[in-house]
Amino acid sequence: MMYIVFIMSVLYVVGFIGFSSKPSPVYGGMSLVVSGGLGCGIIMGSGGSFLGLVVFLVYLGGMMVVFGYTIAMATEEYPETWGSNVVVLGAFLVGLLMEVFMIMWLFSGEHELVGFYFGGLEDLMVLGEGGFEYVREDYSGGASLYSYGFWFLAMAGWMLFVSIFIAIEVTRKRY
């Protein structure tokens, strides 16, 4: 399972490299949707299927509306792909090479594979304690999402609300 999550992580970053290399909005939106789906898959692979589902519904459900508006207004007869321009292809390949070198550096054995500190999350550890062996990670994740992560949900909802108005303003006809 670790290798599947690792492969999804690599594809997740490749999707964002594809978006940041500035292709046509059609392909940029597609790479963001693929990266969002892979991010939800990473969360589900790590044991948080409820949180993965919530992120999938909030991110992909809300942003598909925005992508639909922007793609409808930015349609081109000949959209620019990653291989149609030397600069765009070069930016994509440089980003891909940087990721490959980072992976090689992480697996060289000199550094930890995960160098992040997750201190302060001891309150969420309910599976290893005596009387709570039957509590699934999803339920504690759902409780944490609505208690600790309330501001995350509120901010995500507000950003979706504002992005709809931005999309409507961008697509409004000027007479």
Swiss-Prot record:
Keywords assigned: Electron transport, Membrane, Mitochondrion, Mitochondrion inner membrane, NAD, Respiratory chain, Translocase, Transmembrane, Transmembrane helix, Transport, Ubiquinone
A GO CC term attached to the entry: mitochondrial inner membrane
Compartment(s) where it occurs, according to its Swiss-Prot or TrEMBL record: Mitochondrion inner membrane
Any single GO BP term: mitochondrial electron transport, NADH to ubiquinone
One annotated GO molecular function: NADH dehydrogenase (ubiquinone) activity
Known EC number: 7.1.1.2
Reaction equations catalysed: a ubiquinone + NADH + 5 H(+)(in) = a ubiquinol + NAD(+) + 4 H(+)(out)
Role: Core subunit of the mitochondrial membrane respiratory chain NADH dehydrogenase (Complex I) which catalyzes electron transfer from NADH through the respiratory chain, using ubiquinone as an electron acceptor. Essential for the catalytic activity and assembly of complex I.
Protein name according to UniProt: NADH-ubiquinone oxidoreductase chain 6
Source species of the chain: Loxodonta africana
